[in-house]
Amino acid sequence: MAEKSYVFNDTETTGLNTWFSQIIQIGSVLTDNEFNVEEELNLNSKVLPWVVPTKGAYETHKQTKNLNEGMSHFDMMHFLKNKWLGWGKTKELVHVTYNGMKFDEELFRRQFYWNLIDPYLTTNVNGSSRVDLMVIICLLYTSDAA
């Protein structure tokens, strides 16, 4: 069995609706199985011309430079794909998010698909898997975990 490594992911987006929002910033941190940081990644892309950002998103993350600066969304998603595939060549990756199953993972799938990339990259490649810390915390600290 291959050694496991963890990839902690977070996104900043143009809104909360996963059908219409765009990822404009992705942060990923690769750690070994003892959570020692091996590599960090911070990617930004310009907002696509047909995406209408919500005011609330920009009030939250303050990423206004992405309106005019950064790489193209296509380039960002392909760079991310290549980086994650590189990290996973010799290790089984566990992608870790907070509320990722309902938000970040949905955005990754849609936007990988938009850019002609396998939408199941975080679960279908070299034994990769994922975990949502929000689900674990809800199970540990609430009596009515959903």
Where are these regions (language model features)?
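Conserved non-catalytic scaffold segment of RNase H-like nuclease domains
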Residues: 2-112
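Substrate-recognition/cap helix-loop segment adjacent to the acidic, metal-dependent catalytic center
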Residues: 104-128
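Histidine/lysine/aspartate-rich catalytic loop segments that bind and position anionic ligands
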Residues: 124-140
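Conserved small/polar residues in nucleotide/adenosyl-binding loops
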Residues: 141-146
